[in-house]
Amino acid sequence: MYDEADFFTLENIASIKDKTETQDAPAWGLLEQNYAAISDLLRKVRRTITYNDFYYTNMVVAKDNSSALMFDYNLLGKGYAYTDVRNVLSSLSEEAGKAFLKEYGKFDPAEKALDDVVSVVVTLHLACLRENFPWWAQTLLDELNTTFIEKIELLRRFQ
């Protein structure tokens, strides 16, 4: 069953560094120093079934808006709930995202902090598996030299 946590490995981090030629980015050193603690958090986080493929075209809404049904379950997997929150928010406008979060309710800030780090590695790993590095992963490469260190530091506060 699909699990993003399976992609958070030292081997995949090394492969990303090599394929993207970002070995010298200071964020990698900080991530590797904290890898064991982050992996421990990843093992301990509350687990659930995750959809992993939210996009509005994968949803059918009743004509009277009384119910909705998601379909296209090829990425159905296991993980922590915030992965689906991230996936939903990534495809919504800012206004729609605020409405979604209002209805969704509270989420664990430690889980979000964990996802803010792990999802970068997972997404870069998946991008590096492609023959040509995709445009949608470029912002994450840029993040290595900007906000990724801050995200790792924030996550350390939850350890």
Show where each model-derived region lies:
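A phosphate-binding catalytic loop at a beta-strand-loop-alpha-helix junction
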Residues: F54-Y56
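Alpha-helical structural elements of signaling/regulatory helical domains
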Residues: Q23-P26, N65, E95, P109-A110, ...
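A structural signal for well-ordered alpha-helical scaffolds and beta->alpha junctions
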Residues: W28-L31, G97, N145-F148
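Active-site Asp-x-Gly
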Residues: A62-E103, F107-P109
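Helix-rich C-terminal or lid/interface subdomains of diverse kinases
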Residues: K102-Q159
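Residue-level preference for long, well-ordered alpha-helices that form the structural scaffold
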Residues: D24-A27, L89, A137-L144
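An alpha-helical support segment within catalytic cores of ATP-dependent transferases
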Residues: M1-N52, R157
